[in-house]
């Protein structure tokens, strides 16, 4: 009864903390229908009231024009996807172009000249309006990396400005609402510094989805969690760190959405007896029955796995993992999603992004908690103004909630990144080719060189706890509040920070290290980082 009352109190506090609804942006992939059996899903199976924005992934590009990736998209999936708005008039739909398998070469070619970009912009407006989408999402992974030249960091900004201006002009001419413009961006500080001018992206985009997952996986030599909320000493990668980093670079927090994964990353343990966080590992665990991708399990596959596995809770990172024999998976559940929703509210971010609805237990057949249990958790905590009829997840917060944030000085990134940098593809995108999307052809994308810093394995005696708060170390009492110590790549220790309920959080006031005299061509003008405009001839 005590925990139930605490849950109700937390839910009320979350819903009324800032008096404003948050965005819940949910992706749906166009290869989800080709998964076998009960893992197959079509747009008609989605709940139109679950998310504030639905994003269809992905469109493709041909001859500098946006095009459907598959003929079935235009004939079946687009109409079904946008027909959901007939049931929920407030729902917004966007079409995403790009993705990991898309690569960078077509983006680079399109960005290289004004005429190529103009051709792309015109095709975008035509395709979106023809099929009834409300906006465009750019999933360019990543400007200036993976074979993309360094200049793409700036030509990408040109494209954003030209898209935004064209959307405004089209809205004025047609008297229709302006098309939305968003982008998915990396949550890795090393990639962020190479790929983006964060402050300009913050000015030009309606919202930004931070890919704060795939932070650890089977490409590493020790186990690590896919999407931890907080950082560990010596390992700054976390959702909180990624969000705070983007904010520190000058992006308005209300435009930043935390990416939450509905899947887990797996490892094959070197020894079954050493199964803690930081244990030695050699490659991925077995592929899932439905997703068929090594090192990866959809949430509905995780639910099947944990029924026969041992579960643990990482106190310092507010996320669970499970293991059975030599198989290990770090994943998110309704409890960890709840903690992340609390962090989003406390830090006044714009909301959450979910990758993807088709990896959640969308029919409720596997996890026993109803359809879309993870997305429903976020909907209840971030979107709805009143209690939903959907059963609430069972988890509990202490009155002291911890926050990890960037220190007063931005860390200096010294690690050199090359265009050959190997970065893991986003979760679930394991399609072998553009034209063959059946599950039988799905393979794991080659990873090449790892982008993650070398991690120091944690001691095998590290304390862990089950989700109910019971520690696994002998003789220890359940923890209700854990201090936070986050260490930046520059060695800056941050924390511990304890936020009490009702305490006001002041965003970092120091501006990021943006060059003072570098000018960025923008339309017919050059925009300096401080916002001043000067006339300059354009590319």
Curated annotation (Swiss-Prot):
It is found in: Cytoplasmic vesicle, Secretory vesicle. GO terms for molecular function: chitin binding; chitinase activity. Chitin binds at residues 71-72, 98-101, 142, 211-214, 355. This is Oviduct-specific glycoprotein. SUPFAM superfamilies: (Trans)glycosidases, Chitinase insertion domain. Glycans are attached at residue 402. Binds to oocyte zona pellucida in vivo. May play a role in the fertilization process and/or early embryonic development.
């Amino acid at each position: 009864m005590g925990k139930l009352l605490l849950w109700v109190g937390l839910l009320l506090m979350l819903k009324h903390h800032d008096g404003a609804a948050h965005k819940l942006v949910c992706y749906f992939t166009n290869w989800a229908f080709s998964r076998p059996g009960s893992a197959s899903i079509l747009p008609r199976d989605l709940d139109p009231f679950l998310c504030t924005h639905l994003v269809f992934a992905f469109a493709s590009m041909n001859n500098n024009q946006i095009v459907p990736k598959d003929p079935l998209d235009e004939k079946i999936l687009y109409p079904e996807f946008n027909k959901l708005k007939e049931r929920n008039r407030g729902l917004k739909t966007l079409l995403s172009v790009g993705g990991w398998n898309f690569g960078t070469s077509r983006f680079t070619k399109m960005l290289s000249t004004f005429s190529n970009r103009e051709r792309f912009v015109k095709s975008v407006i035509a395709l979106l309006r023809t099929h009834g989408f409300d906006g465009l999402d750019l999933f360019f992974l990543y400007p200036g990396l993976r074979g993309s030249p360094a200049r793409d960091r700036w030509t990408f900004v040109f494209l954003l400005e030209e898209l935004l201006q064209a959307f405004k002009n089209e809205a004025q001419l047609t008297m229709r609402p302006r098309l939305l413009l968003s982008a998915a961006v990396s949550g890795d500080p090393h990639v962020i510094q190479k790929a983006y001018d964060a402050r300009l992206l913050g000015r030009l985009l309606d919202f930004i989805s931070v890919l704060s997952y795939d932070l650890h996986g089977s490409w590493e030599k020790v186990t690590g969690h896919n999407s931890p909320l907080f950082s560990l000493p010596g390992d700054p990668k976390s959702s909180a760190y990624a969000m705070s980093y983007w904010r520190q670079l000058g992006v308005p927090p209300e435009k930043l959405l935390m990416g939450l994964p509905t899947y887990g990353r797996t490892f094959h343990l070197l020894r079954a007896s050493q199964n803690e966080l930081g244990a030695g590992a050699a490659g991925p665990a077995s592929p899932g029955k439905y997703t068929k991708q090594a090192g990866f399990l959809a949430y509905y596959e995780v639910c099947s796995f944990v029924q026969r596995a041992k579960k643990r809770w990482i106190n310092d990172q507010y996320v669970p993992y499970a293991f059975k024999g030599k198989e290990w998976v770090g994943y998110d559940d309704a409890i960890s999603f709840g903690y992340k929703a609390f962090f989003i509210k406390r830090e006044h971010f714009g909301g959450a992004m979910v990758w993807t609805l088709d990896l959640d237990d969308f029919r409720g057949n596997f996890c026993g908690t109803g359809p879309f249990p993870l997305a429903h958790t976020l909907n209840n905590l971030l979107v709805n103004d009143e209690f939903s009829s959907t059963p609430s997840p069972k988890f509990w917060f202490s009155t002291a909630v911890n926050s990890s944030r960037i220190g007063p000085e931005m860390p200096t990134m010294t690690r050199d990144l090359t265009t050959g940098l190997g970065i893991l593809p986003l979760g679930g995108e394991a399609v072998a080719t553009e034209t063959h999307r059946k599950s039988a052809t799905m393979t794991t994308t080659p990873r090449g060189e790892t982008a993650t810093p070398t991690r120091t394995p944690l001691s095998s005696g590290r304390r862990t706890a089950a989700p109910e708060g019971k520690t696994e170390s002998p003789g220890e009492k359940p923890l209700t509040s854990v201090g936070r110590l986050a260490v930046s790549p520059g060695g800056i220790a941050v924390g511990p920070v304890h936020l009490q309920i009702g305490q006001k959080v002041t965003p970092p006031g120091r501006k990021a290290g943006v060059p003072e005299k570098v000018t960025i061509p923008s339309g017919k003008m050059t925009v300096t980082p401080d916002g001043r405009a000067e006339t300059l001839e354009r590319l």
